[in-house]
Design a protein with these regions (language model features):
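Conserved active-site-adjacent core of cysteine acyl-enzyme catalytic domains
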Residues: 1-68
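Alpha-helical context
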Residues: 11-14, 64, 86, 95, ...
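Solvent-exposed soluble domains appended to multi-pass membrane proteins
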Residues: 58-61, 65-78, 85-91
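Generic surface-pattern signal
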Residues: 65, 135-138
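Short acidic, glycine/serine/threonine-rich helix-capping segments at coil-helix boundaries
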Residues: 76-80, 89-135, 142
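Glycine-rich phosphate-binding loop of ATP-dependent small-molecule kinases
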Residues: 145
Length: 145
């Protein structure tokens, strides 16, 4: 697994639609909670000491000092382009042979994916794009249980 640092931007955690670990100011110290789901303006936070709390996002948004999301980064190593092309093809964004070699068609398909997901269109497999691509199938989502 890989770790992506969200900074203090909860909107990014919501965009990724994956449970996140948030560090929040509590007096002079920080506490750690899990952002389990967001529905509308409400979020379920799980605190190891206080248990589950459903709170309006606006009540704790400015208290967040850092956040991280763990994701399975399949796009490392020699076969990263091959896996990327397969994933883009499965999503209907890449209609060409899967070769494992990056080119303008792969870049164009990746830009379509980035645009669809609200990411900056770079055509590069940056970390934010890898997080969004990993958010498939069995990956947990920010939805109520």
């Amino acid at each position: 697994f890989s770790v992506y640092k969200l900074g203090s931007d909860i909107d990014k955690a919501v965009k990724f639609n994956m449970p996140s670990i948030l560090y929040m100011k509590q007096g002079k110290t920080n506490k750690c909670v899990v952002l389990r789901w967001v529905v509308g303006n409400d979020a379920l936070l799980i605190d190891p000491r206080e248990g589950k709390n459903i709170l309006p996002v606006k009540t704790f948004k400015n208290m967040i000092t850092e956040g991280v999301v763990f994701y399975k980064n399949r796009y490392k190593g020699n076969s990263r382009v091959l896996l990327l092309q397969q994933e883009l093809k499965a999503r209907g964004l890449y209609d060409y042979p899967v070769t494992g070699k990056a080119g303008p068609r792969t870049k164009q398909a990746l830009m379509k994916f980035q645009e669809r997901e609200g990411l900056v269109k770079t055509g590069e497999l940056d970390e934010e794009t890898a997080v969004m691509l990993s958010n498939t199938g069995g990956a947990p989502k920010l939805t109520p249980e």
